[in-house]
């Protein structure tokens, strides 16, 4: 694991060796997760493509440095200013990504984002048109604000992030519960354990901030316009049994892009797959990624 300071926060990342392919695949994880879940895909794709995965600010190993008592007074004002500027909105995380790519001298990239990471990838494509050559959204979609559903989701999410004691990691059988959450079939116990760790370790401010800033009515309604403005190719991969981001909502957002035709050329559905496609069906996802990239070689 390597680390780069981005706006005062150490960002953990893994970068595989360069290959003959001109584009770097950049993997962006979702809410309360980390870069770890991309490893099955990276193992399959890194022989052909250089791959970068990193932990979003406040998640995984990208944790803010605690403010010491000696300088807390001087920094409190700047922190308050940052907090009022939607620093946990997807667009803010896309700016973090732009700085990371600049620091790593990556000038040609395809962004592959899961769930919230997909939204960040779309914003990244809008902010970095010279660098981002295309986007693949995994288990990501939306663009329809259903007031009651979103209010319920935000309320449940806030309760979740409030009750995350570290001792939860030691609770017998808790990893078994996480192997069955939001997936079509139970995933390996290893991944259940990883999900518990990432759930508990996410920074409280980031966990709550990303939830609230990414699910406002304005933010959700902005997505279709964002997708429609993108000149780069954008593809959406859905899990047929995803109950978090149902395929119909994935296709809805995909339909605003120029690649979408009567048959939905840029919307792909993977059978027997829930909300963690990169862990549940890595071979199928890798095959779709290879196929997409083969149509955009330059």
What are these regions (language model features)?
Residues 6-9, 14, 53-112, 116, ...:
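Active-site loop/oxyanion-hole signature of alpha/beta-hydrolase fold enzymes
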Residues 29-31, 109, 113-115, 239:
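Conserved alpha/beta-hydrolase "nucleophile elbow" surrounding the catalytic nucleophile
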Residues 147-148, 168-229:
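Conserved alpha/beta-hydrolase catalytic His-Asp/Glu region
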Residues 126, 133-166:
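Flexible "cap/lid" loop of the alpha/beta hydrolase fold
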Residues 22-30:
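Short beta-strand element of the alpha/beta-hydrolase
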Residues 30-40, 51:
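Serine-hydrolase catalytic-loop signature spanning alpha/beta hydrolases and amidase-signature enzymes
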């Amino acid at each position: 694991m390597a680390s780069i300071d981005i706006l005062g926060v150490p960002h953990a990342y893994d970068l595989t060796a360069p290959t003959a392919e001109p584009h770097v695949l950049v993997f962006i994880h979702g809410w309360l997760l980390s870069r770890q879940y991309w490893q099955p895909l990276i193992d399959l794709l890194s022989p052909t493509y250089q791959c970068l995965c990193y932990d979003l600010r406040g998640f995984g190993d990208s944790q803010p440095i605690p403010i010491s008592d000696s300088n807390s007074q001087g920094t409190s004002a700047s922190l308050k200013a940052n907090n009022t500027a939607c620093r946990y909105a997807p667009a803010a995380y896309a700016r973090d990504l732009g700085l990371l790519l600049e620091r790593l001298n990556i000038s040609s990239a395809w962004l592959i984002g899961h769930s919230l990471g997909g939204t960040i990838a779309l914003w990244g494509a809008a902010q970095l048109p010279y660098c981002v050559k295309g986007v693949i959204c995994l288990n990501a979609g939306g663009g329809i604000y259903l007031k009651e559903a979103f209010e319920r989701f935000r309320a449940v999410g806030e309760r979740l992030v409030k009750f995350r004691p570290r001792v939860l990691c030691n609770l017998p059988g808790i990893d078994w519960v996480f192997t069955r959450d939001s997936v079509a079939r139970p995933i390996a116990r290893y991944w259940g354990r990883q999900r518990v760790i990432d759930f508990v370790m996410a920074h409280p401010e980031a966990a709550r901030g990303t939830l609230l800033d990414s699910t406002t009515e304005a933010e959700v309604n902005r997505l279709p316009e964002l997708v429609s403005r993108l000149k780069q190719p954008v593809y959406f991969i859905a899990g047929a049994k995803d109950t978090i981001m149902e395929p119909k909502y994935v296709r809805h957002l995909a339909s605003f892009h120029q690649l979408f035709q009567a048959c939905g050329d840029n919307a792909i559905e993977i059978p027997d797959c829930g909300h963690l496609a990169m862990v549940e069906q890595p071979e199928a996802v890798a095959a779709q990624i290879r196929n997409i990239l083969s149509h955009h070689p330059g």
